């Protein structure tokens, strides 16, 4: 019999699983769910193994099958992204970013990036990884009317400040950034362009968002668990020469990682194959659903930002909830109703610590089979809460609503016999 405390821990996990998988509308823009098949492949002995180094050049023995997995994953990502070099060893998008910064900037160098209030990720700024590497930053200018980087002002800034590295991509990311235009300006001062594709990686793989490497970026980094619905992890893909790629490779190991969380490789491969087969349909539906949610919110009196631009071209929707008490209050009230969003700073906020907005992403609910009609229902739930209805009453309706959306779509269907076959192959005790 298990100790009582382990039963208590199991109960916590069980209750979490039931709550987030079956009872909530999950609109966190940085999350997703793996397919049942990918989850099966995620459970394996590699969770406890090391493989320092690179394929064919390891510092540990016992890695012959790790090499097969890593090599296969690198080759498939390289083909899909049309990249000269891919590294799948970073354990997160942030680690991928840090390794790239370290490899491509001199000591005390300068990075041009978007601040948090314009959507920049913390790893792009002095509150995060840039500061840890003692790099200087200059802020890319923002065009509020177009909710995007101000191209003309960015050209001027690049010419004047001559940054070593320019970071595009964002944490709040509604519209594709002007990669081509910025890359042309970067070329005049010898700067590298990195596009952080963490949020839109699945949309890129699905073919509904521009591939930054084909737009002129030297590097794209990503995480493998947002719109790309795999296990948590990171990836770097480049259009650089061998020398620069080797610098990035050495920055990943030994500088920023020692263990690569090898058990994720097989599940990531499964997800990539699923995206090859189902990705265009899935990614297209994500963008359609995001637009539908935004339009429905507007009709409910909860207008998202960027109305004149069509609200969004990604999985995300951002709403200024100042008149409903601000981002903190709105997100907390919605959680009471089992609608999970996050507070988020908007460009006009005086302090990112007091955000006026909330950010939503539709990628997870899309994977559970929801479409435009369901987005309209979700908008009604959100509006009911923000207009002051008791969240407990809305929660009852949300739980009932979710009962019809428990099966993960856009993946391979496997029957019970196939599940048992895969599980028995991976189960360490058989």
UniProtKB/Swiss-Prot annotation:
Pfam families: SHMT. It comes from the Archaea. Its EC number is 2.1.2.-. GO terms for cellular component: cytoplasm. Keywords: Amino-acid biosynthesis, Cytoplasm, One-carbon metabolism, Pyridoxal phosphate, Transferase. It is found in: Cytoplasm. Catalyzes the reversible interconversion of serine and glycine with a modified folate serving as the one-carbon carrier. Also exhibits a pteridine-independent aldolase activity toward beta-hydroxyamino acids, producing glycine and aldehydes, via a retro-aldol mechanism. This is Serine hydroxymethyltransferase.
């Amino acid at each position: 019999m298990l100790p009582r405390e382990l039963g208590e821990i199991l109960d916590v996990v069980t209750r979490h699983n039931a709550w987030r998988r079956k009872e909530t509308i999950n609109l966190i823009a940085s999350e997703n769910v793996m397919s049942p098949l990918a989850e099966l492949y995620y459970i394996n002995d590699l969770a406890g193994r090391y493989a320092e180094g690179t394929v064919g050049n390891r510092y540990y023995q016992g890695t012959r099958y790790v090499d097969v997995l890593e090599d296969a994953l690198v080759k498939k990502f390289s083909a899909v992204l049309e990249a000269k070099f891919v590294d799948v060893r970073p354990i997160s998008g942030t680690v991928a970013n840090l390794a790239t910064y370290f490899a491509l900037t001199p000591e005390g160098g300068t990075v041009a990036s978007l601040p948090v209030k314009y959507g920049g990720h913390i790893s792009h700024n002095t509150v995060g990884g840039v500061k840890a590497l003692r790099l200087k930053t200059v802020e890319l200018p923002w065009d509020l009317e177009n909710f995007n980087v101000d191209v003309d002002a960015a050209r001027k800034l690049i010419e004047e400040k001559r940054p070593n590295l320019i970071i595009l991509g964002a944490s709040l990311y509604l519209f594709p950034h002007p990669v081509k235009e910025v890359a042309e300006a970067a070329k005049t001062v010898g700067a590298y362009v990195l596009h952080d594709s963490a949020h839109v990686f699945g949309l890129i793989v699905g073919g509904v968002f521009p591939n930054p490497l084909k737009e002129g970026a030297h590097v794209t980094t990503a995480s493998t668990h947002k719109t790309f619905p795999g296990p948590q992890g990171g990836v770097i893909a480049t259009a650089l020469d061998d020398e620069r790629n080797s610098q990035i490779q050495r920055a990943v190991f030994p500088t920023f990682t020692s263990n690569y969380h090898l058990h994720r490789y097989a599940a990531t491969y499964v997800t990539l194959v699923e995206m090859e087969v189902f990705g265009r349909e899935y990614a297209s539906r994500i963008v359609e659903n995001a637009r539908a949610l935004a339009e429905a919110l507007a009709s409910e009196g909860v207008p998202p930002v960027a109305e004149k631009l069509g609200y969004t071209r990604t999985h995300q929707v951002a709403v200024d909830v100042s008149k409903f008490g601000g981002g903190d209050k709105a997100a907390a009230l919605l959680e009471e109703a089992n609608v999970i969003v996050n507070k988020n700073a908007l460009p006009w906020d005086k302090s990112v610590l007091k955000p006026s907005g909330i950010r939503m992403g539709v990628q997870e609910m899309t994977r559970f089979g929801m479409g435009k009609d369901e987005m309209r229902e979700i908008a009604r739930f959100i509006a009911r809460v923000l207009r002051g209805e008791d969240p407990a009453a809305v929660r009852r309706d949300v739980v009932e609503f979710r009962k019809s959306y428990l099966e993960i779509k856009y993946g391979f269907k496997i029957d019970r016999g196939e599940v048992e076959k895969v599980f028995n192959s991976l189960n360490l005790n058989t």
